[in-house]
């Protein structure tokens, strides 16, 4: 732990914290930074707890030095950001004492404290042992019940840090996911997005250990999806078709992944899940033609249902088909009505697509 503390002290000494600590009555670093420093993960976020009387003084300190900051909750939570070095500093009011504050934390490895002013670490021995042994364990039996979002955070931490989950904590996480319906969609969304960017091999192992559902057979498929550049297009600014493609597999087994989508994203996922495509020309062409405005919907359906050796072929087909241009001038001159015109154009497109299909 000494190496981790030295890294933290060295990092903080280069920030405004080095001066701030001389102007407050107490300043305790807690949680993720200590954990990440111990595991050798680059430091980005620093969470502090301070006395209520110091909180306003910290705000004034930042204003005077023109350090970018804002308040998420005037009474309880103040988020401060130092733009000079891209670190995020969170300041929260200490809950009476370190012991009481620690008891309200989520997991033991996040309930380790460092007293910045006195340069002393404060933590229970068993909490430090969990960190050293890479064991995810709740601080107390009500930790996840108090805030069900911690169930997803636990899954993510276990994935990202290759943690084993303590037996009773597994039970609490499983119970917690059933309570996510009571959590704001925005908070769930943030955690699920992070989970989607975790190592899927680790995620599959964690989900198996928690819920008994073995998705190991999907790993080659997930790896293939990651390589599909055609699925990189964003549905929203923070979610891509690649993300929805993965989710369309996960939701078949884990309902709690359904709690975070926007209406538009749900429509896409439902189409992906319900679209049935067979591996023959007629079925592929109909899926392509009926989804020309959003070709990625059938591509996602293909990526999650076809044999892996046929997925690449289908993706190549759709890519080539999308580049085919049909000269409609002659059709327009034939005097066909709108319905007849559409049927004729489809027929000509199908002929050209069939040629490409037979060449591959």
What spans do the regions from the language model cover?
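Catalytic cores of the polymerase beta-like nucleotidyltransferase superfamily
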Residues: 1-360
